Design a protein with these regions (language model features):
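Sec-dependent signal peptide cleavage junction
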Residues: 17-51, 239-240
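Short glycine/proline-centered coil/turn motifs in the loop regions
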Residues: 63-68, 162-164
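Append "Rare intracellular matches occur via the same short Y/T/C beta-strand/loop motifs
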Residues: 101-113, 210-215
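Residue-level recognition of secondary-structure-to-loop junctions
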Residues: 76, 91-99, 103, 111, ...
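Short loop/turn motifs at secondary-structure boundaries
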Residues: 48, 59, 131-240
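Surface-exposed, flexible coil segments in extracellular/virion-facing regions
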Residues: 66, 71-95
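Bacterial Sec-dependent N-terminal signal peptides
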Residues: 1-24
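Short, solvent-exposed loop/turn segments at the edges of extracellular beta-sandwich modules
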Residues: 110-121, 216-220
């Protein structure tokens, strides 16, 4: 009789287990999209190094399992701080990071049995290391000359050594204060973008022009440049 009773208990446990699906540990991933549209895939514990702003898309890769309720939590920390500045409760999430420094993104994934409320898989920080998003301090430089002669070198006037700039406005003027060209954040520092030394489609004369650049970095630093720029014609690299 005792053996029959034990067998019944065993069969009951097997039937209860079969009513629930099998839980497999998820492997969260992230996709970082830079302001230039560059894509970087991250696995758990990986670090991204780049410039602000970036968009981070987070994927828990956690499937719903029969017999369990699923809870996914994303906590966002600034490095060195104990309390998160943001918490999301979704299987997938997205955040734009516009501040320089290190942002830690820590996932927690929990499956809870609907039968006995037992937490089957507490995937906490000991299992999942945070994603590290490290964004450089801001910086920007403005040249004082360019040579739009079609040789592929310095053909456009634009800023350079750009790092973590989130606001930008640039303008070129002639000696009488007439505005000849303006450009913004989308063209800032990009190859093949900027002023090509023309106005209304026609080349302007060689000489001195005036540039105004106003920008703001992800670290809160504000930049303002007001200076002359020399437009050189008939000049090639090496002076030939």
């Amino acid at each position: 009789m005792r053996n029959i009773f034990l067998l019944m208990i065993f069969l009951s446990s097997v039937l209860a287990a079969s009513a629930q699906g099998q839980v497999v540990q998820p492997k969260p991933t992230a996709l970082v999209v830079s302001s230039r549209g560059e894509l970087t895939d991250l696995e758990i514990g990986d670090q991204y190094d780049g410039e602000a702003p970036v968009t981070v898309r987070l994927y828990s890769n956690a499937d719903e399992v029969e017999g369990y309720s699923l809870t996914c939590t994303w906590e966002f920390f600034k490095e060195g701080e104990e309390e998160p500045f943001l918490t999301r409760h979704d299987p997938d999430a997205e955040i734009e990071i516009r501040e320089s420094g290190v942002t830690l993104i820590r996932p927690t994934i929990v499956y809870t049995s609907r039968t006995n409320s037992e937490i089957f898989w507490p995937f906490d920080s000991e299992v999942y290391e945070p994603f590290r998003i490290q964004l450089a301090e801001s910086g920007i430089k403005v040249p004082n000359a360019f040579s739009p002669n079609g040789d592929g070198i310095n053909d456009y006037f634009n800023v350079f050594d750009v790092k973590s700039i989130i606001e930008f406005h640039g303008a070129i003027y002639n000696r009488w204060g007439q505005q000849l060209f303006v450009w913004g954040l989308d063209e800032m520092g990009r190859e093949g973008c900027g002023w090509d030394g023309t106005y209304n489609g026609r080349p302007v004369k060689a000489g001195v022009y005036y540039v105004v650049v106003i920008a703001k970095g992800a670290d809160g630093i504000e930049y303002e440049f007001r200076r002359d720029v020399n437009l050189l014609r008939g000049y090639t690299e090496g002076g030939k």
